[in-house]
Amino acid sequence: MSIQSIVTKETLKKKDTNIEIQEKNMNDLVESASRVIAPLWPISTFAAHHPWMGLEKQSFEQVANWLKEARNVDIYPSASMIHSAKAKGEIEESFLQIGLSRWLDSQSFHIPRETAERFCQEALKLERLPSSLLSSPELNKLAEEISYINTGSMEDSSMQPISSLIENQKGDNLSDVLNYHIIKWCKLYLDDSGSSWTMPNREKGLYRAWHHLITFDPALSKNERKVLKDWPQDAQGALTKALSELGIPESNRQAYLEGHLLSLPGWAGMIRWRSQQSIKEQALVIEYLAVRISMELAIVKPYLPLKNQKAEKKVSIVPLIASWIYWGDISTREWLQMSATEQSELLAFAYRFDENTRKKLWLEAWEQTHAEQLKKKISSKQRATNDKKRVVAQLAFCIDVRSEPFRRHLEKLGPFETFGIAGFFGLPIATTELGSNNSHPSLPVILKPKHQIKELADENEYKSYEQRKKIDSSVSYTFKTMKKNVLTSMLLPEVSGPLLGLQMITRSFVPRRVGGFIRNLRKNMLQKPNTTFSLNHVHDTKCEIPIGFTKEEKVNYVRQALKMVGLTEKFAPLVVMCGHSSQSTNNPYAAALECGACGGAAGGFNARVFATLCNLPEVREALSAEGIKIPEDTIFAAAEHKTTVDELEWIYVPELSEAAQEAFDNIESVMPNVSQHANRERLTQLPNFKMKIKNPSKEAHRFAEDWSEIRPEWGLARNASFIIGQRELTQDCDLEGRAFLHNYDWKQDENGDILASIIAGPGTVAQWINLQYYASTVAPHYYGSGNKTTQTVTAGLGVMQGNASDLLSGLPWQSVMQSDSETYHSPLRLLIVIQAPTKYIERLLNNDFTFREKVQNGWVRLASVDSEGRWKNW
């Protein structure tokens, strides 16, 4: 990525961010350029992704400045967000003043400190300069009179596509015309919804399929098709030729490719994801750029060569002078009385203290306020082991922020101990449910599955289940087939109208009852028989990954997970592994509400597999030999936390011992109250909701079943911290559902491997989730996906606004906004708090270069709490 300073004159230059571009072949060039976009997963397996994951070698500030310059995208919170947060008490003014003093101390300037501070204090109010001042003849005349001051110049380092510089006779920008064509070809090639008519030659790749059809495209003019008639057969040759004919010098080609990738980051992100899934499509990004830039050449060729194509940008001094007049209280007369050196110093200072710098200081003050509030909340004094209350059940929940309120209310209502662990429970598996031919990678998307686990049933019971499932699927298949067929699609409304009309009326007016009826009907009809898993290792050459586990692998995964949460002794009679899932209707983003650690799927499958492994005699015997002795009367069970309705659904309960049965009954007895309290807390945070809720659980079910409900739950909005430590650190704290919680006992981690594993796995997932919510909040027009009510699900891949927009990569407006003008999510970078001695943190940072880079470059924040309870910011 090419990030260059905004001006070249030394007095106005910001921190040098030049990155040299060396000669590379086209593959390397495209690979380097691809860092500016993030892979985009299909919406059916919606995985939180960090939009700047390829740019972490640069600082957050550098990337923010580059995006502002290259795409006019602001990734700092807006002034309205900052003012709102300050009004709510989320930003302490003292932290802003500390930040300003540090910034002033770091700068070299030759104006009185008092003058600089006065200017900064006024500028930090984030008021816009009045348009009347900026356009005043007096100001512009003053700017002309002192124009002899050389403010420097710059080349357009972002290398905007040439098409973006041209308008056709209709007044349409040619980049919009180009995007229209590219969206069409991407939809045709990437379509994953089983269209009746697929793109011809699709199996040969995007470029060759496009090359075969482009000369017949009626949307292009005759001259445009003529340009592409004898175009190279291979993508690399086409891309090289197009860049040459457009006159893009080799030194600027990477930046030019970046500009094109950023023009449609959603479609380009989906292309990049596909290129990473198979060897067959590994050159897909090159093919995409070859198609795009070849078409750009055809469209812009009549306008070439452009006049002033390489014109340099000048830094306008008008807003710089205006800022000193408005914020620094310097009149035009005083300006004229200054020497050129004094004027230059003032302009340089105003330039350095730009909008991004001001918002950066506000963001850091906001983050420091949150850290200080969290520091005051959490208890740093761990209870002595013998002071712990006797527990009858231990429940392990996903680290998901939605688990925190549920765990808190559960612990208050009974003798229960809860743990936090990544919801895939450390099992790198691909799951295949009963009767399915497809497997799902049920683990974080940053990992690859190593084992395939299939759900199995008795042959006779399975046949009966399969028949019922075929009846259910045949109805859906028939409807979809009729819908796609040219003739039957005209008959379908007449046939299905009355039934669908009745469904629409009942779904709209009595959603909870109808939704519950349909759900129960399908549940009874498709009731699974008793199932088991293919846990034992089977060598199958037809499978890419082995089925099941060896004995050593079973023991290893159980040991690893138990040690990770510090559960190696004092087992309760009942240990429950709790995955989590969501429940909503008519929601394209359903996968976004599922378990991120399970690749956008429910976590129950993993929970059940892990609990089953823990109950195996062979596993217990091996663990006992290693010192992890699980009592005979301790039973592992599995459940699923339904986050939309805050209920616990049992999915695996083996035969229980007497003590375990007592614990089970205890959990069942308090669960209605837990659900009531958790639902009440969660529902009152939804906008325009009545503060007095007679029956919170009933209301939660209505939200889950109502197909017109745009916000069935807040998901992971307002997430802000990831706390790694023992439960005692946070047990009595109301963390407001804003913290990822992962158990960790540094005393059982002498070499630091467990901590390193938590940071590399769950820590990375939490960071991706955090930055996706951050990006969708601060730049919803670029990194979000707009309003849910106007979205179109396209090609089985994702959503668009209308039928000719980018493939929208982020979260919808309803996931982060409370109203048109007020945000719900607080855009703060993730604060990772680790409960461990200082030497553990130092070792982690020394050994994990990637994590150290994230901390140093401002992509995450880091703090620690040592054994004496001392808090340290890193």
UniProtKB/Swiss-Prot annotation:
UniProtKB keywords: Cell membrane, Membrane, Metal-binding, Transport, Zinc
Detail which positions bind Zn(2+): 398, 400, 580, 595
Membrane topology is:
Peripheral membrane protein
Primary location class: membrane
Specify the superkingdom: Bacteria
User: What GO MF terms are annotated?
Assistant: zinc ion binding
Q: Name one GO cellular component term.
A: plasma membrane
Cited Pfam families: DabA
Q: Where in the cell is it found?
A: Cell membrane
- Cofactor(s) the record lists: Zn(2+)
Q: Does the keyword NADP apply?
A: no
The UniProt function text for this chain reads: Part of an energy-coupled inorganic carbon pump.
Could you tell me which PANTHER family the record lists for this protein?
INORGANIC CARBON TRANSPORTER SUBUNIT DABA-RELATED, UPF0753 PROTEIN AQ_863
- Summarize the subunit comment: Forms a complex with DabB.
The Swiss-Prot or TrEMBL record describes its family as follows:
Belongs to the inorganic carbon transporter (TC 9.A.2) DabA family.
Recorded hits in HAMAP family, A to Z, give: DabA
What is the protein name for this chain? Probable inorganic carbon transporter subunit DabA
